[in-house]
Amino acid sequence: MAHDTAFLGASTVLGQYWTKRRYFDYLINKDNFQLTFGRSFRMMVYLDNAVANGQENMRRDIEADTRATNYLINHLADIKPEFTVFVTTCDMLAENADETTQPLAGSDDPYVQNRINLYRELNRQYGRVLNVHLPEIASPTNRGFSKLIDTLLCPPEKGKLDIAPLEMHQLYFAQRILGDVEKCIPLGIPSIIPAMPPLTTTEITEAIAPQLLDRLPAFSPEQPMGSRRTSIHSFQWLDPRDGYLVTREDQLELLKFYFAPDLL
């Protein structure tokens, strides 16, 4: 039986937060990835490329995302974990999905297809896996995770903002990840969507950047409607069971706490 633990993506935003609070025998990033080859691990945390480096960053450089994803897929067989926490995105799931929803079989969007490919191969090759499907990650310090947050924190000097006023966002704070995952592991469940209450672009703008409300564009039917995913396991966090891990009121307060503390 293996005893060592490994964290793949330790130098990233989520990785640094996680590994400062929990010990891992191997802290792995792209420079020392080969240290995992031929080794067995009792537990391994594995970050998808979009979670590690930012969903918007990966969308802007699909070629780099595809190269990195294919490299990870090609070396899955070189690592032998007994239990894996695979942290990926919700992009492979329908916009109204829960944990009973099957991931998309394929996508014309190469960014989404990369998420599908790694998810499919990792779950095929590894035995015990907890799949953590993060919604839109919100970071107050790192750009490239959420287009909405990036736009509100660093808006262009003038003109209407390139965001949809009624699009729904389920912003997930990186500081939650450790507690949410550790709550899931004893449950023995195969997947979790740590679903936050959906808020519109307008509501989020009003909460953290009210000075930009008059720069929101008018609504049009062609604009995206956003994410309304829920979790069948939400009752482990919150009662009553409504599909979300926190209340709408708490989500708004947390947004202000992390992104606009002067408005509290």
What kind of region is each of these model predictions?
Residues S11-V13, D48-N53, C90-L93, E136-S139, ...:
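Short, solvent-exposed loop/turn segments at secondary-structure junctions
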Residues L178-D239, G243-L264:
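Mid/C-terminal beta-alpha module of Rossmann-like enzyme folds, strongest
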